[in-house]
């Protein structure tokens, strides 16, 4: 069925940090859609002439935006949103990790999976890169719930073998088997993708990181995501655990985990050298405004990332973040960058870009989602 949607249309088919003309806005716009694919986007009157026999859904008084894209969010942390007053490692120890141990119960995990996907959809998020659970069946429940909702999700089993609660630990051999199990389960689902996810370098031994490397080498369709440079204490701990590494990024690089399909969350305290190497390797950064503010982690050095042509998008980081709203994260980008060490003003076009196409570019999905270019 072909349909012409009439409403105000806003989207950014170009990088709004690179082009002043990136924002496409049409007060009386139209979007021609056929079987989920965009045929045309533009002025309603012109499209009505071009498609005279197509049925019209008149949404005058409303506006249409591309689906939002969340590049960093934790499925098992839905019910701990709002745990304020902590720094990162204390928050993990007191709130996040105790809650995540509950996902050993498949029934509990299935309940939260439904809450999670409804939370995404209710806030306009149609695509997300998601930290799954430490448990296979819980992560499978997330994939099933996302599929039933029609969301586009990249996720995977969260891997750790040290420094967390024992219940959350795996072994390299078990991680290898469990990841293959989940990859096979979602292989026939076009809107589901798999990410290799060591929780962060602190919680991953060299043998576990070798497993991550082997998984990525074996299957080029997989993504990689983890945390980096989120808090000063975290960085100090990584330095003590990997004394051979010149910086945090070097840990992931030594195991060949940083490439075009890699998304590194936070990067608040990155060195210029790390940002430059992220650019060279084609990786992306997930910028999590509300979480970094709520946990007192710091303000993302956006200007330094832009100066080095590093790719970045936004993530809500539920539950360190304060909710599912990607537009709220984009607004926070404007507010916090005014207060940054090297301040800058984020325009409305750039905010919309961060909430939509930037995430699509980070996930190499910009040929299918992120804006209203015909064919998407």
List each language-model region with its residue ranges.
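Acidic, glycine-enriched loop/beta-strand segments at the rims
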Residues: 14-28, 295-296, 302, 360-376
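His/Asp/Glu-enriched, well-ordered alpha-helical/loop segment
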Residues: 254-261, 303-376
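Alpha-helical scaffold segments that flank or form the walls of functional sites
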Residues: 32, 82-151, 175-188
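Active-site gating loops and adjacent loop-to-helix segments of metal-dependent hydrolytic enzymes
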Residues: 79-109, 157, 162-172, 231-259, ...
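N-terminal metal-binding scaffold of metallo-dependent hydrolase/deaminase domains
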Residues: 1-50, 62-63
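Histidine/acidic-residue-rich catalytic or RNA/ligand-binding cores of hydrolases
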Residues: 232-243, 274-279, 296-305, 322-338
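Metal-coordinating catalytic core of metallo-dependent amide/deamination hydrolases
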Residues: 137-267
């Amino acid at each position: 069925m072909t349909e012409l949607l009439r409403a105000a249309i806003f989207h950014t088919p170009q990088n709004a940090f690179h082009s002043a003309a990136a924002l496409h806005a049409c007060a009386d716009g139209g979007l021609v859609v056929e079987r989920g694919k965009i045929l045309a986007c533009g002025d309603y009157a012109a499209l009505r002439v071009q498609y005279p026999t197509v049925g019209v859904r008149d949404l005058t008084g409303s506006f249409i935006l591309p689906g939002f894209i969340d590049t960093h969010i934790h499925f098992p942390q839905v019910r701990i949103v709002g745990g304020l007053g902590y720094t990162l490692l204390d928050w993990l120890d007191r709130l996040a990790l105790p809650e995540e141990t509950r996902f050993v119960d498949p029934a509990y995990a299935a309940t939260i999976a439904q809450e999670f996907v409804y939370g995404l959809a209710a806030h306009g998020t149609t695509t997300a890169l998601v930290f799954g659970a430490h448990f296979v069946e819980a992560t499978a429940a997330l994939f099933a719930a996302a599929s039933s909702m029609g969301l586009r999700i990249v996720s995977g089993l969260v891997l750790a073998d040290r420094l967390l609660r024992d219940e959350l630990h795996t072994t390299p051999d078990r991680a290898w088997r469990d990841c293959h199990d989940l990859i096979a389960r979602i292989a026939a689902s076009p809107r589901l993708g798999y990410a290799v996810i060591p929780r962060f370098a602190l919680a991953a031994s060299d043998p576990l990181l070798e497993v991550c490397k082997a998984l990525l080498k074996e299957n080029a369709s997989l993504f990689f995501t983890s945390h980096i440079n989120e808090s000063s204490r975290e960085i100090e701990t990584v330095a003590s655990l990997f004394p051979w590494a010149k910086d945090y990024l070097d840990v992931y690089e030594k195991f060949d985990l940083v490439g075009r399909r890699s998304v590194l969350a936070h990067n608040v305290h990155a060195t210029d050298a790390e940002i430059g190497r992220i650019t060279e390797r084609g990786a992306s950064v997930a910028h999590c405004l509300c979480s970094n503010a709520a946990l007192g982690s710091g303000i993302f050095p956006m200007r330094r990332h832009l100066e080095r042509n590093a790719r970045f998008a936004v993530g809500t980081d539920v539950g360190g973040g304060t909710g599912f709203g990607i537009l709220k994260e984009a607004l926070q980008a404007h507010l916090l960058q005014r207060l940054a060490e090297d301040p800058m003003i984020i325009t409305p076009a750039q905010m919309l870009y961060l909430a939509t196409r930037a995430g699509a570019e980070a996930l190499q999905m910009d040929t299918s989602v992120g804006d209203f270019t015909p064919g998407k």
